[in-house]
UniProtKB/Swiss-Prot annotation:
Disulfide bonds: C80-C93, C122-C134, C129-C147, C141-C156, C168-C180, C173-C178, C230-C489, C354-C361, C391-C397, C497-C520, C503-C523
Record carries keyword Magnesium: no
Species, as recorded: Bombyx mori
Effect of inactivating the gene: RNAi-mediated knockdown results in delayed pupation.
Quaternary context: Interacts with CPAP3-A1.
InterPro entries: CE4, Chitin-bd_dom, Chitin-bd_dom_sf, Glyco_hydro/deAcase_b/a-brl, LDL_receptor-like_sf, LDLR_class-A_CS, LDrepeatLR_classA_rpt, NODB_dom
Broadest EC class assigned to this enzyme: hydrolase
Entry protein name: Chitin deacetylase 1
């Protein structure tokens, strides 16, 4: 029996030793695998920008749906939903037919300038290109490639542009010409929030024509009055094609603001991000020429810009706006925040991050006001619901499905402004969203009437009227007699013409199309376009 016991003990010891050996071998293999994984991860993530998505395998089908991203906690993978491919350049899922870069694994790698080196590479006032060539500092990030390798235009965000605007300096930035604050939430004039009139700006984008004129008449019917007794007002960002300029003329006569939204409304969003100063001038200053001529607007009141698709054009857009004497932009979106942001001038650095996918925000100092678009909170139950990304345009808040939901949405977002710093509340629309959803329109009109009846400190005003208040802050009591808010208070009389000229026109710039232009003025020779905004044929 003793012999069997010794054999059993020996067998147990051998098994234990084998188990130890297997354990050590498994740990060594695991360690080696971990090292290989870490090495592979380092290789994959080398030279990748923060937050950049890329493919492991290029090609059509599922390969074009799958991308990965390097994060602090390791590799993260996603797959686009069925029917969508991942657009490497746009860094987002898009419809299959719209994605043309399935064969690309990574975004195009751009050569970066040598801005940060242990020893200076250039003399004072000069900076180094990616190939170590020195050029003047002011040539960096000016919209033109001055380095042989183009690197002077490849590192131009707010953190890297060597000519970026300085942080807000309230001792230098003084009303009425300049307004800034460190976080963008300071009330102009340091008024207590309870003394600030709550401004609401309603805006509509795109053409004004027979598809939406009756909708606008229903909303702005002359019966809805601000506390000062004047009609409520809106701002229209007008694009050219299919616009009825006699209707624009009448809208302006009624005291609403007309602003520009481009001539072509170019469908390629990347165009607006990368357009030159000259491109922006033709689109926006040209659109102003068209509006002023064919709507007979002669009071220099067309001073606002909003880019199509809310694609910010960086320094080029704002340089054009300075050169063409535009007063304000309303394209830049601020992420959902509490409290909300007030309008600011672009002399100093933006008080919030550049928000949105692949946006190109301005980095330099510009003599332009920004009517920043505060994102709206689309949660149905803000006290319980999980965080949801905000939305800038009301019609992009995709979870609004019923009139009751829209009514609650309006009340919640109004309260977020009214009960905090009373930053202007922007409600930005495309007319079709209200026209095609009568339940939404009914809820909207009910809400406007309710707000006007229950508050004596809420004003529906234009974008320019907001800036006029920021430049010269007035309390709720003083607002009733604030002269800029009483212009065209309640307009009576007849339109400039009852039956406009219907001009069937063509243009070399729009080949193969005959387009109808309606105006109270005489018909031009050609359909107005980028190189011929007057339509007189002078290219």
């Amino acid at each position: 029996m003793a012999r069997y016991a010794r054999v059993a003990t020996l067998a147990a010891c051998l098994l234990f030793a084998c188990a130890l050996a297997d354990g050590h071998r498994w740990r060594r293999q695991a360690d080696e695998t971990a090292k290989k994984d870490e090495s592979l991860e380092q290789e994959l993530c080398k030279d990748k920008d923060a937050g950049e998505w890329f493919r492991l395998v290029a090609g059509e089908g599922d390969n074009c749906r799958d991308v990965i991203q390097c994060t602090a906690s390791g590799i993260q993978a996603i797959r686009c939903p069925a029917g969508l491919f991942f657009d490497i350049e746009k860094q987002t899922c898009d419809w299959k037919d719209a994605v043309k870069n399935c064969k690309l694994k990574n975004k195009e790698r751009k050569i970066k300038p040598l801005l940060y080196t242990e020893e200076p590479l250039c003399q004072d006032g000069f900076l180094a290109c990616g190939d170590s060539t020195c050029i003047e500092r002011g040539l960096f990030c000016n919209g033109e490639k001055d380095c042989g390798d183009g690197s002077d235009e490849n590192s131009c965000d707010i953190d890297n542009d060597p000519n970026r605007a300085p942080p807000c300096d309230s001792s230098q930035c003084v009303l009425p010409d300049c307004f800034c604050s460190e976080d963008g939430t300071v009330i102009p004039g340091d008024l207590p929030a309870r003394d600030v009139p709550q401004m609401i700006t309603i805006t509509f984008d795109d053409a004004i024509n027979n598809n939406n004129i009756e909708l606008y008449k229903e909303i702005f019917n002359g019966k809805r009055k601000n506390p000062n007794g004047c009609d409520i007002k809106a701002t229209y960002f007008v694009s050219h094609k299919y616009t009825n300029y006699s209707a624009v003329q009448e809208t302006h006569r009624k005291g609403h603001e007309i602003a520009v939204h481009s001539i072509t409304h170019n469908d390629d969003e990347r165009f607006w991000s990368n357009a030159t100063v000259d491109d922006w001038g033709k689109e926006m200053a040209g659109m102003r020429v068209i509006i002023e001529k064919f709507s007979n607007i002669t009071d220099n009141s067309v001073v606002g810009v909003r880019a199509p698709y809310l694609r910010v054009g960086g320094n080029n857009q704002f340089t054009m706006m300075e050169e063409q004497a535009f007063l304000y932009d309303s394209t830049i979106t601020a992420p959902l925040s509490n409290p909300r942001l007030c309008p600011y001038t672009m002399y100093f650095r933006m008080p919030h991050r550049c928000h949105g996918n692949l946006q190109s925000c301005p980095t330099r100092s510009h003599a332009v006001w920004e009517m920043v678009m505060n994102e709206l909170d689309r949660r149905e139950d803000p006290s319980n619901d999980e965080y949801l990304p905000g939305c800038a345009m009301v019609d992009s808040c995709s979870n609004i499905l019923t009139g009751d939901q829209f009514y609650n949405f309006l009340n919640h977002n109004f309260d977020r402004h009214y009960e905090q710093n009373r930053a202007p509340l922007g409600l930005y629309f495309h007319a079709a969203w209200l026209k095609n959803n009568p339940e939404f329109l009914e809820a909207f009109l009910y809400w406007i009437d309710e707000i006007l009846q229950s508050h004596n400190d809420v004003y529906f005003v234009t974008m320019t009227q907001v800036i006029q208040w920021v430049q010269n802050p007035r309390t709720v009591t003083e607002a009733k007699n604030f002269e800029p808010w009483r212009e065209k208070c309640s307009v009576e009389g007849n339109p400039a013409c009852w039956v406009p000229h219907s001009c069937k026109l063509t243009s070399k710039e729009v080949p193969g199309e005959t387009i109808n232009l309606q105006t109270c003025l005489r018909c031009p020779v050609n359909y107005p376009w980028l190189n011929d905004p007057t339509g007189d044929g002078h290219y």
